[in-house]
A protein has these predicted regions:
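Conserved acetyl-CoA pyrophosphate-binding loop and the N-cap/start of the following alpha-helix
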Residues: 86, 90-98, 108
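Conserved active-site alpha-helix within GNAT-family acetyltransferase domains
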Residues: 105-109, 115-141
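Conserved acetyl-CoA binding element of GNAT-fold acetyltransferases
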Residues: 70-84
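Short loop segments at secondary-structure junctions
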Residues: 51-52, 85, 149-153
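A short beta-loop-alpha structural element at the N-terminal edge
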Residues: 2-15
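Hydrophobic pocket/interface hotspot
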Residues: 15, 19, 120
Length: 180
């Protein structure tokens, strides 16, 4: 039976290996990103485990919304990983839902991500541009830039999503064009 729970410091090695395997050619980069992102004590990591083995992980990291009225503390859901042999069984969806519940309980108004709209829209995410949100980088394809509006969201909260500095340091924002 799969159990969802907060990530513990003792999970670090298993979570690192999970991201390394799940992200294939980009696994080392993503694993290093996770190592650095979790250094922020406001980051929220959740794991899915079965019989003591970590099968999935999601990380929610503080960011900002640069709204006309003021800066708004928000979160970014990134990354999400499930072991390849455990995918398509609802583990990733369960981790995302649990993460959104935790963010709502903390009074976070919006959670942003860049990802597959077909997957994340089923979990309550909407196109960011539809609510006046701007991508932090033009390298993020418009359809991939998504937001989950939580109960603390107010309509005046529009503007540019600002990733945590760690994403920029790892060059993990949007897609690079090798032919540019």
């Amino acid at each position: 039976m799969v159990l969802l729970r907060p990530e513990l410091p003792t999970d670090a090695a298993a979570v690192r290996e999970l991201h390394r395997v799940a992200f294939g050619d980009h696994g080392e980069v993503v694993a290093g990103l996770v190592d650095d992102l979790r250094a922020d004590d406001r980051a929220v990591g959740l794991v899915a485990e079965d019989a003591g083995a970590v099968l999935g992980h999601v990380l929610l990291v503080p960011g900002l919304l640069d709204a006309p009225r003021r800066l708004v503390p928000v979160y970014t859901l990134s990354p999400l990983a499930v072991l390849p042999g455990s995918q398509r069984r609802g583990t990733g969806s369960a981790l995302v839902r649990a993460g959104l519940q935790e963010m709502a309980a903390r009074g976070v108004p919006v959670v942003f991500l860049e990802g597959d709209p077909a997957f994340y829209r089923r979990l309550g995410f909407v196109a960011g541009a539809d609510h006046g949100f701007r991508r932090p980088s033009l390298r993020i394809p418009e359809p991939a830039f998504q937001a989950a509006l939580l109960p603390a969201y107010e309509p005046w909260m529009t503007g540019t999503h600002v990733y945590a500095e760690t994403f920029w340091r790892h060059d993990a924002v949007g897609l690079r064009d090798p032919d540019a």
